[in-house]
Amino acid sequence: MKIITCYKCVPDEQDIAVNNADGSLDFSKADAKISQYDLNAIEAACQLKQQAAEAQVTALSVGGKALTNAKGRKDVLSRGPDELIVVIDDQFEQALPQQTASALAAAAQKAGFDLILCGDGSSDLYAQQVGLLVGEILNIPAVNGVSKIISLTADTLTVERELEDETETLSIPLPAVVAVSTDINSPQIPSMKAILGAAKKPVQVWSAADIGFNAEAAWSEQQVAAPKQRERQRIVIEGDGEEQIAAFAENLRKVI
């Protein structure tokens, strides 16, 4: 059983600054980290490895220079995967969902897999598209919002997901792509032994050419900016008579 768990390196939101001049975001001081939602996918994959005999877990990511960071690689491997594959190329530096999914699908095909796990979304964009797009590109079943994995056999995965007013149980034929929600588990903090052992695990570094990737982005991002801040008007209306109520209503109309 070959399980691939996908993850994305995202900027640490605590260190993102806003340029006052134009509202653009400054990522220069923001270190990269594993997207919080993908930590759940990594944990789920490693829990399955404990249940399935001879299962192997491969962590997979596509991106830019953030994936060259040795500390980041060790962080991923210390959480349980047996090996790591990173696809590094400048074109993936700010990749959007369609491009990311196409690259992940190509890399997964090259690596081989029975099951692909990923987070429901990413901490930066949270587009909630990549998992389903990977399934569409590979022409295999894809399910999102999975909150519990019930069982795994050689050819079927049984899962649950919480809908608005019911719990849905699904049997999914393998190979398949499953996007998990944060309700599925609580990611463990790696032990010192796991952190030290991560340095001995294999890492494969591929380029876009290595996976035969030559797709162009369907659309391009023009700008990312923080919402413009409006100054508070600080209007105080004293009294509770009809005139004050009318003034209050008039001011509400101006801002709605």
Swiss-Prot record:
UniProt keyword list: Electron transport, Transport
Pfam families the UniProt entry points to: ETF
Domain of life: Bacteria
GO BP, one annotated term: carnitine catabolic process
UniProt-recorded Gene Ontology molecular function terms: electron transfer activity
Pathway annotation: Amine and polyamine metabolism; carnitine metabolism
InterPro entries: ET-Flavoprotein_bsu_CS, ETF_a/b_N, ETF_b, ETF_beta_N, FixA, Rossmann-like_a/b/a_fold
SMART domains: ETF (SM00893)
Annotated family: Belongs to the ETF beta-subunit/FixA family.
Summary of the function given for this chain in its UniProt record: Required for anaerobic carnitine reduction. May bring reductant to CaiA.
Quaternary state and interactors: Heterodimer of FixA and FixB.
Name this protein carries in UniProt: Protein FixA
Organism from which the protein derives: Escherichia coli (strain K12)
Gene of this entry: fixA
